[in-house]
Amino acid sequence: RAAFGRRAEVLARNLDAVHQEQETAVLSEARRWLDVYFGGQEPDFTPPLHPAGSAFQQEVWALLRRIPCGQTTTYGALAKQLAAERGLSRMSAQAVGGAVGHNVISIIIPCHRVVGANGSLTGYAGGIDKKAALLRLEMKMTR
């Protein structure tokens, strides 16, 4: 939740309008999802998320949501999958990585499940140590 807190602080500092905190159905569902997840269980529901992003980013984020809990994939594999779905011969893993990096709903849209081509843990907004911890938590969930 710390990563969400930092992002909320950045948003609050950059808002021109008055910021008012209130509980909404989406926030309530996201909180419930996170409570289940950090309680060590794989949530059996997805909050009704509507992240803002380009059509390409939306496609990549949809792929991220299809990566099973406790498993990882590579940027290259995501690029191949998206290229196949679009009927293209290939797609840039770097472009996919850029879209993954713009995911602002980390954990629920599981960008932490994407690793480098050699299986190494690569960039994560919350830090590599947090990415490793999330993957360990998921391994325990799926045993």
Walk through the language-model features, giving the residues of each.
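Nucleic acid-binding interface residues in structured DNA/RNA-binding domains
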Residues: 32, 36-143
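Compact structured core domains
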Residues: 1-46
